[in-house]
């Protein structure tokens, strides 16, 4: 099916970079399949979405892989580490599991709620960590500029102030809000009705975000890192 729907030759031509993550079942380590470094094939895409227990592990070059969401469901850090230092970034970060929810009332709803927390918590953690890191780097550069000349040659001072200025990063955080009829099987329930509902919800959230006045004014803020959650 993927070969009918996806033009892998176009992906591997390099005009648009594609990176997908999967976790090695035997080592527990995250692996990145990056079109800038690897020829992307259908099995790479299948591995990146092989979330157990609904989907079996996928074998690639003798190793077995599951969905990378088991380690990092929104791998923002990989994008930031791989981008060019001077480039400003506009990131649309899609979170299919909401960190916010109600207290479970049964074993079944507990299963669904713990999936929400498990797969969404790293998203907010990574975003918050990135903002703190940007502020720390900027403070280090400002402090270095105030040092007297005899201290600017200190190796520790040069290390703190090294590198280019961090790029300006704008993140649109699109969070899926669960419907009332979903249950604990939502991570592997792919009926036609569910897919149509999910596609429609995604379109509404994107349109609502792009039309929001805060998004239109995003370039006027003084922060190097701006996170917008405007789809609620």
Task: Please place each PLM-identified region on the residue numbering.
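A short acidic-Thr-Gly-centered motif at the start of a beta-strand
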Residues: 10-13, 50-62
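Short beta-strand scaffold segments in enzyme catalytic cores
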Residues: 18-23, 56
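Short beta-strand-initiation
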Residues: 15-18, 53, 169
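A short alpha-helix-loop-beta-strand transition element characteristic
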Residues: 7-19
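Extended hydrophobic/aromatic segments used for targeting, binding, or gating
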Residues: 43-44, 53
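Non-catalytic peripheral regions of patatin-like phospholipases
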Residues: 1, 23-41, 62-63, 69-232
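Signature of the catalytic double-stranded beta-helix
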Residues: 1-7
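Short alpha-helical scaffolding segments that buttress acidic/His motifs in well-ordered protein cores
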Residues: 20, 45-49
């Amino acid at each position: 099916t993927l070969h009918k729907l996806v033009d892998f030759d176009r992906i591997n031509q390099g005009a648009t970079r594609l990176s997908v993550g999967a976790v090695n079942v035997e080592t527990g380590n995250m692996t990145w399949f990056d079109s800038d470094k690897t020829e992307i094939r259908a099995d790479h895409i299948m591995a990146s979405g092989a979330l157990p227990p609904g989907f079996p592990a996928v074998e690639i070059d003798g190793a077995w892989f599951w969905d990378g969401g088991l380690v990092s469901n929104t791998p923002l850090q990989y994008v930031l580490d791989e981008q060019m230092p001077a480039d400003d970034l506009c990131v649309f970060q899609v979170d299919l599991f909401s960190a916010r929810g109600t207290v479970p009332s049964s074993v079944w709803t507990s299963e669904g709620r713990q999936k929400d927390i498990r797969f969404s918590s790293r998203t907010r953690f990574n975003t918050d960590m990135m903002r703190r890191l940007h502020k720390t780097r900027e403070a280090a550069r400002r402090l270095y500029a105030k040092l007297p000349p005899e201290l600017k040659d200190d190796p520790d001072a040069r290390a703190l102030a090294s590198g280019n200025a961090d790029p300006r990063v704008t993140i649109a955080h699109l969070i899926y809000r669960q419907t009332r009829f979903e249950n604990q099987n939502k991570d592997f329930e792919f009926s036609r009705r569910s897919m149509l509902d999910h596609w429609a919800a995604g379109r509404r959230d994107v349109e609502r975000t792009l039309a929001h006045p805060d998004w239109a004014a995003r370039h006027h803020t003084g922060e190097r890192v701006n996170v917008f959650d405007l789809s609620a």
